[in-house]
């Protein structure tokens, strides 16, 4: 599950946000650096000429982290999940900020470059995935173009990528979910399953 690497960095930064404990932050920076290095190794597997120079459906994978079962939603077959990639984006952003806080200029410049390149590739991937699947919402994964607002929601909170997400597709995503929610609430459709993961959407609507 490749969300974990970015989540580790995010957790370390979040602890610092509350405590302002720079001694703690410095003691964990080696873990931050190792997590970034591992993220780089995953990105490298999808940064080859095959993915760089392929058709749109192949280039949609370029520069992402590799496939995983992600948030357990792809346990039947690992996918290139945007859940993983948005947590990767969050981790790289926080890792860069941690270096600034600690005055580690060399590490900051290195991670900043990784972050900025990943950001460009992530949003290129989203555009290509939506184009290939002919969809007007943010997909859950590259392969499926699946609608999964309970996954996409983390792009807004805690990953804070709203300003960068393509419009109107991000609005369409949450409008589509809200319609599904109200139709269930009002007994307009037959349904069985409800997942508590849907609670994640509350932060995005707020």
Which residue stretches match the model-derived regions?
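Alpha-helix N-cap/helix-initiation motif
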Residues: 1, 21, 25, 77-81, ...
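The feature captures the catalytic groove of carbohydrate-active enzymes
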Residues: 1-7, 40-117
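Alpha-helical context
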Residues: 8, 15, 64, 68-71, ...
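Conserved helix-loop functional segments at active or binding sites
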Residues: 14-17, 41, 45, 101, ...
